[in-house]
């Protein structure tokens, strides 16, 4: 069994990404990034409150194959494919309002990676 460390795209097809989108975008190309950056202190304050809430707010990322050690990538979801996670959005009203102001936003979350852990190279359908 060989290991595939290349860029992969889908839950079902772990082959190389075949799309035409860039791997990274320049934030300066999007007007809404300035609004998020200008409000980073509010976002950070709400994140700190969630983290102080303990492990019940952090969930292991659902796709264990994307990390070198399971349970090391943790997430707090706000939106996933347009579905709003009210549990977290209600605790972070400023962050939620900022996210909802992003045109075309489908998915958003806070993410944390344990020290000495690795997220494998990938390109998903929302980045």
What are these regions (language model features)?
Residues 1-123:
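Fe(II)/2-oxoglutarate oxygenase catalytic core
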């Amino acid at each position: 069994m060989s290991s595939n460390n290349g860029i992969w795209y889908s839950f079902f097809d772990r082959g190389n990404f075949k799309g035409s989108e860039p791997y990274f975008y320049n934030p300066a190309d999007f007007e809404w990034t300035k609004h998020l950056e200008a409000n980073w202190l509010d976002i950070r304050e709400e994140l700190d409150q969630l983290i102080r809430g303990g492990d019940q707010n952090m969930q292991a990322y659902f796709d264990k194959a994307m990390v070198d050690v399971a349970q090391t990538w943790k997430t707090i979801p706000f939106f996933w494919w347009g579905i709003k996670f009210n549990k977290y959005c209600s605790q972070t009203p400023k962050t939620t309002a900022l996210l909802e102001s992003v045109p075309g936003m489908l998915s958003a979350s806070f993410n944390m990676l344990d020290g000495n852990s690795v997220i494998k190279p990938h390109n998903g359908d929302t980045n």
